[in-house]
Amino acid sequence: MSDQPYEYYVDIVTKRYFHGIDNGDMELVMGCFHPHASLREMSSNTLHDGYDAIREMFVGLFAAHSRIWHGNFVHTADTLECAICSQFSVEVTSIKTHQLVRYESCNRFYLEDGKIRSVFVYLSGENLLK
């Protein structure tokens, strides 16, 4: 059981994690992760295991896109299991092609000690999290 209230889960996901991604703020994004975190993109079964692997994945994501936006959030938090599921829209603009691509996504986050311990990412299109 979590000692964090429901609002904490929504805050770490929207005001820290996704806000950091949308603004290219690596320190803010990585500050959300537990030292032994993992991130798995489920459609391609791509695993980023560990803090350094996740950071490397975000370096690539930020380098490939001039704009990243997440919005239209719908959240369901389960404080007993220290988890939150977030559905949202994503827009990214490629630096290489200048093409805007829209996705729908759903992420399932599990927290430990107030940090993201594991996240499972479901994307409606190509895996951007290589």
Region annotations inferred by a language model:
Residues 25, 37, 66-69:
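Secondary-structure boundary/capping signal
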Residues 38-48, 60-64:
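A short gly/proline-enriched turn/hairpin at secondary-structure junctions
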Residues 23-26, 45-48, 95:
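Alpha-helix boundary/capping and short turn/kink residues
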Residues 2-5, 55-130:
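A beta-strand edge to alpha-helix "cap/lid" segment located at domain peripheries
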Residues 1-35:
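Short, low-complexity N-terminal intrinsically disordered segments enriched in polar/charged residues
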Residues 22-25, 41, 78, 107:
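Acidic side chains
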